[in-house]
Amino acid sequence: MADWVTGKVTKVQNWTDALFSLTVHAPVLPFTAGQFTKLGLEIEGERVQRAYSYVNSPDNPDLEFYLVTVPDGKLSPRLAALKPGDEVQVVSEAAGFFVLDEVPDCETLWMLATGTAIGPYLSILQLGKDLERFKNMVLVHAARYAADLSYLPLMQELEKRYEGKLRIQTVVSRETAAGSLTGRIPALIESGELESAVGLPMNKETSHVMLCGNPQMVRDRKSVV
C-alpha cells in the first residue's frame, strides 16, 4: 500500500481560470526527475487521489505540481480551492519510468508535451544532470491558447542557462500567437514545419523523441514516425 504523508500548501499560482500550480512542503522520499506521485484529499469520508508529476527539480524542497481543473471532477476543483496553510495528502514514494535513465544516447533529444504534461521535462531540465550525452535538446510545449503556456518564462530561462544546447518552441492550436507555431504537433512534424522552426532534423538516426501529454498526440506522433 502507498505510504501517505501530510503536506502543507505554501503557494497557489492561478495561471488561468482552469490552470494552476500547487507548491507543497511534505516529507517525501527522494525522487527522480520525470517521476510522479499522488495527491489526495478526504472528501465525503474517503480519500480521493490522482497522480501528478513533479515540476520541481528533485533537489528543490518546494514540491510543485501543474494542474488543470476538471469542472465536474471530484478532486481537481478541491485542489484548486486550497490556500497556503491548507493540508493535502501526498504519497511519499514517487513512481514512473519517464526518466532519463530510459533514454538512449543520441545527438538530439526531442521533448514534446501538451498541456500540463510539460512538468516532467521542467523537472529534468531544472536538475540538469545526465544531459551531457545529448548534443542538442528541444523542448516543445503545445497548448490551445498562448495564455495556457504557463511556464514559458521558465522555459526561456532554461534556454538561456543551456547556452544554445536547448531550443524551445511553443505551439498553439486555437489562435495565432507571436513566437508560437499554429496547429498540432503531429501535423507540424509531418509537414516539416516544426523541424524548420527549430533548425534541427528529427530522424531515427540522430534523434530520440520523448512524448508526454494528450494520448491522441502520442498516437498521432507515433504514426507519423
What are these regions (language model features)?
Residues 120-130:
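Histidine-anchored nucleotide/phosphate-binding helix
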Residues 51-61, 100-112:
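Short, compositionally biased
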Residues 2-5, 140, 145-225:
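Reductase modules of NAD(P)H-dependent flavoproteins
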Residues 2-86:
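Ferredoxin-reductase
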Residues 42-46, 92-97:
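Short, charged beta-turn/beta-strand-edge "cap" motif at the junction between a beta-strand
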